[in-house]
A protein has these predicted regions:
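Rossmann-fold dehydrogenase core element
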Residues: 93, 108-125, 146-148
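C-terminal substrate-binding/catalytic lobe of Rossmann-fold NAD(P)-dependent oxidoreductases
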Residues: 5-7, 12-65, 142-246
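Short, ordered loop/turn segments at secondary-structure junctions
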Residues: 99-101, 123-124, 153-155
Length: 246
């Protein structure tokens, strides 16, 4: 049984993780953290997420956590750097499901991965990992298309624009397809849309669209747990969700 703690326990992803762990006997939730100002501090994590009581209270300090196998961070970028430092100092595997990092933040993350197994996952959906696999298998011939762009749709409350997933896909494509111009990203924020990311390849004669749509937010929690289980057995290093099926 893998012992898990969550930083950012009260957000959408954090609550989805609590729900998923409560239904999976391979995992045990033994700690959760949120900011000091959070009104849920001191509450039972299970009850907070609408599950049965698990006698694990939400804390405001990473230092309150017991020894864990994997720390999953789904907080904001500025707070997740505390998780990076904590995991590094406590020799704990870390899954970062956070976006919005600055260049200096990425340097800190890469440096920490020399000391711990660290999975950086702006999107923990296995479908996005499979989409990248398709690109890997076909990248040698994709230069046939003159135009390459990414479009994304998110709910109106999504903070980062473009999303971390779109930036990650753009970087992934740029490393595999030689292009002179940058990849354009079109972003839509409205209502409570199902999350969608689309890669569009075209020329004057034809067009291909590779699309991934998240029909339920539980896919991110499920993917994160798959990633956590995989990460625990890995040596120190910086990993992505694509590495799980490489």
């Amino acid at each position: 049984m893998l012992k898990i703690a969550i930083s950012g326990s009260t957000g959408r992803m954090g609550l989805a993780l609590i729900n998923a762990i409560s239904k999976d006997k391979d995992f045990k939730l033994i700690g959760g953290v949120a900011s000091e100002s959070n009104s849920n501090i001191g509450k039972d994590l299970g009850e907070m997420a609408g599950e049965k009581r698990i006698d694990v209270k939400l804390s405001s300090k990473l230092s309150d956590l017991p020894e864990v196998d994997v720390l999953i961070d789904s907080s904001e970028a500025k707070f997740s750097l505390q998780s990076v430092e904590y995991a590094k100092n406590h020799n704990t595997a870390l899954l970062l499901g956070t976006t919005g990092y600055q260049e200096s933040d990425l340097s800190n993350i890469e440096e920490a991965s020399e000391f711990i197994p660290l999975l950086k996952a702006p999107n923990t959906s296995m479908g996005i990992a499979y989409l990248k696999k398709v690109i890997d298998l076909t990248s040698d011939s994709l230069s046939y298309f003159d135009n390459l762009q990414i479009s994304e749709k998110h709910h109106k409350d999504k903070k980062d624009l473009p999303s971390g997933t779109s930036l990650d896909l753009a970087n992934f494509l740029s490393e595999r397809i030689v292009r002179e111009s940058p990849i354009n990203i079109e972003s839509e924020r409205t209502g409570d849309l199902a999350v969608e990311h689309k890669i569009i390849l075209s020329n004057d004669l034809e067009r291909i669209e590779l699309s991934h749509k998240a029909l339920d937010r539980s896919i991110y929690a499920k993917g994160a747990l798959i990633g956590a289980k995989w990460l625990k057995s890995k040596p120190n290093g910086l990993y992505s969700m694509s590495d799980i099926y490489s």
